[in-house]
């Protein structure tokens, strides 16, 4: 099956573990989810046929849950428990670890300088963002007023773009989240946690941008 003309966001939602494949190739399926596979591959100078073959293998597996057809209220509850609550746990712990690593290894050239600052910025931005969703946007959607939420949704999508840009800065600061050979246990654990955060946040944004928001605006 030809996947090249389909949007990345749609593929990430319809094929099991496609999101992990896109992450491996550094293809943005959340904020850039509307671009086709062919366009995303061309931008990264990747062979689209190789990626299509990998997607075809993944597509043979059953999908755990197809959120594209789930009720909007169920999607919202899932987002809060699976992503919002998780980010609220992840970021404070990562900030503590980054503070320690930057302090203890300040003399090493490979230390991720500025990481604490960028994680703190992401924490502050996401905390404000998630609160606005939970207090304003999500109740509107649950009350069937999603079609009137064009303003709040455009603000949320803009904030998603800003979070995505911060993730790119964090990846650059951490050598694409790759610990150096001399990294201590805390350093390695922190990078594992950052990888998990990036995976979670990209899935979170994709579910909102590519499923929840379009369906809410369509008047569901």
Curated annotation (Swiss-Prot):
<comment type="function">
    <text>Di-iron-containing protein involved in the repair of iron-sulfur clusters damaged by oxidative and nitrosative stress conditions.</text>
</comment>
<protein>
    <recommendedName>
        <fullName>Iron-sulfur cluster repair protein YtfE</fullName>
    </recommendedName>
</protein>
<dbReference type="InterPro" id="IPR023742">
    <property type="entry name" value="FeS-repair_YftE"/>
</dbReference>
<dbReference type="GO" id="GO:0005737">
    <property type="term" value="C:cytoplasm"/>
</dbReference>
<keyword id="KW-0346">Stress response</keyword>
<dbReference type="Pfam" id="PF01814">
    <property type="entry name" value="Hemerythrin"/>
</dbReference>
<dbReference type="InterPro" id="IPR019903">
    <property type="entry name" value="RIC_family"/>
</dbReference>
<keyword id="KW-0408">Iron</keyword>
<keyword id="KW-0963">Cytoplasm</keyword>
<comment type="subunit">
    <text>Homodimer.</text>
</comment>
<dbReference type="GO" id="GO:0051409">
    <property type="term" value="P:response to nitrosative stress"/>
</dbReference>
<dbReference type="InterPro" id="IPR012312">
    <property type="entry name" value="Hemerythrin-like"/>
</dbReference>
<dbReference type="Pfam" id="PF04405">
    <property type="entry name" value="ScdA_N"/>
</dbReference>
<keyword id="KW-0479">Metal-binding</keyword>
<dbReference type="GO" id="GO:0030091">
    <property type="term" value="P:protein repair"/>
</dbReference>
<comment type="similarity">
    <text>Belongs to the RIC family. YtfE subfamily.</text>
</comment>
<dbReference type="GO" id="GO:0006979">
    <property type="term" value="P:response to oxidative stress"/>
</dbReference>
<dbReference type="GO" id="GO:0046872">
    <property type="term" value="F:metal ion binding"/>
</dbReference>
């Amino acid at each position: 099956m030809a996947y090249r003309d389909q949007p990345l966001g749609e593929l990430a939602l319809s094929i099991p573990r496609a999101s992990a494949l896109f992450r491996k190739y550094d293809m943005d399926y959340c904020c850039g989810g509307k671009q086709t596979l062919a366009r995303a591959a061309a931008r990264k100078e990747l062979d689209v046929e190789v990626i299509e073959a990998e997607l075809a293998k993944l597509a043979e597996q059953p999908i755990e849950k197809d959120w594209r057809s789930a009720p909007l209220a169920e999607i919202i509850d899932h987002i809060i428990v699976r992503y919002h609550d998780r980010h609220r746990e992840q970021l404070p712990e990562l900030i503590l670890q980054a503070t320690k690593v930057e302090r203890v290894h300040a003399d090493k050239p490979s230390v991720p300088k500025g990481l604490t600052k960028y994680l703190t910025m992401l924490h502050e931005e996401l905390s404000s963002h998630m609160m606005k969703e939970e207090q304003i946007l999500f109740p509107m959607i649950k009350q069937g007023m999603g079609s009137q939420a064009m303003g709040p949704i455009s603000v949320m999508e803009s904030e998603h773009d800003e979070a995505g840009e911060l993730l790119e800065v964090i990846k650059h600061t951490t050598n694409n989240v790759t610990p150096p050979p001399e990294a201590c246990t805390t350093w390695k654990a922190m990078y594992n946690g950052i990888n998990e955060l990036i995976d979670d946040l990209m899935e979170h944004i994709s579910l909102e941008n590519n499923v929840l928001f379009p369906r809410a605006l369509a008047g569901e």
